[in-house]
A protein has these predicted regions:
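Repeat-blade elements of multi-bladed beta-propeller folds
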Residues: 6-35, 52-78, 98-125, 146-182, ...
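Short, surface-exposed connector motifs at secondary-structure boundaries
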Residues: 187-190, 260-262
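Aromatic (tryptophan-biased) beta-strands that constitute blades/sheets of beta-rich domains
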Residues: 1-15, 38, 43-54, 86-95, ...
């Protein structure tokens, strides 16, 4: 059963992005445009112009504080008014790169990372969201801080816990068994509070489970990890648990146990 469909462009470069729902409307990016569609009919309600296309379309926009933040090619993030889809500002990263990491919002700032290549540097950044120059639709935004890492950041969505933001890095090699890192930084200053080594590129959003008070994440090397973050922003490394999903023939059952373990 197909209720409606809407063609937004042609060719793989215009493939629709992952969508989000904002105020009972569907937000989707395609080619160099961002659209607001009616959920029931698919009619285009608003259209906004983006300064670049997305990278493959699988990193969705993020909504927060009345704004939509679009991850775009060449290390760009563009902010839009969520009601009108008018552009508010544009961030251009100093090292550029593909915008492949989900955008996280917390207390007036967004956090995201970029990727250039397996063995090249890229930045993870904290960007203030305030529209400081409402007269300039493409106001050039600057990062509050940036963290540079060899190998960059790929699917590396962050989680904010209190005053700290936690995210992971690639391992800086072309294989899958190098040493990546999961980092805890002061979310306002970018000061590194702690780091834990992981096997392979850390390529997942960091998840937090309130019941177990644990962080969970995976790596390209085939590992599932779990550990706790202390109130001072350092990791409780005595709580670190690791599961090799490739080698463990009973991996799914053990993963369930790891997820349930407090």
């Amino acid at each position: 059963y197909e209720k409606w469909f809407k063609k937004l462009g042609s060719g793989w470069g215009a493939a629709p992005s992952v969508q989000i729902i904002v105020d009972n409307s569907l937000i989707v990016m395609s080619a160099n445009h961002i659209y607001k569609l009616d959920l029931n009919t698919g009619d285009i309600l608003q259209t906004g112009d983006m300064v670049a296309a997305t990278n493959f379309g699988y990193t969705p926009p993020t909504y927060a504080d009345g704004m939509i933040f679009a991850p775009l090619a060449d290390g760009r993030v563009q902010a839009f008014n969520a009601e009108t889809l008018e552009s508010l500002w544009v961030y251009q990263d100093t090292l550029k790169g593909q915008s492949l990491s989900p955008i996280t919002y917390s207390d007036g700032y967004i956090y995201t990372g970029f990727w250039n290549a397996e063995t090249k540097d890229a930045n993870y950044v904290c960007i203030p969201v305030t529209d400081e120059d409402p007269t300039n639709a493409q106001e050039a935004k600057e990062a509050a801080w940036q963290y540079t890492s060899l190998g960059g950041f790929y699917w590396a969505g962050s989680v904010v816990r209190g005053d700290y933001v936690v995210f992971g890095t690639d391992d800086g090699t072309s294989g899958s068994d190098g040493t990546g890192h999961v980092l805890s930084l002061n979310k306002k200053t970018g000061e590194v509070m702690d780091s834990v080594d992981v096997i392979g590129d850390q390529r997942s959003t960091i998840a937090y489970d309130k019941e177990t008070d644990r962080l969970y994440f995976t790596t390209k090397g085939g590992y599932l990890y779990s550990l706790k973050l202390k109130s001072d922003g350092t990791f409780d490394k005595d709580t670190l648990k690791t599961l090799n999903l490739y080698d463990d023939v009973d991996g799914f059952n053990n993963a369930a146990g790891l997820l349930a373990d407090k």
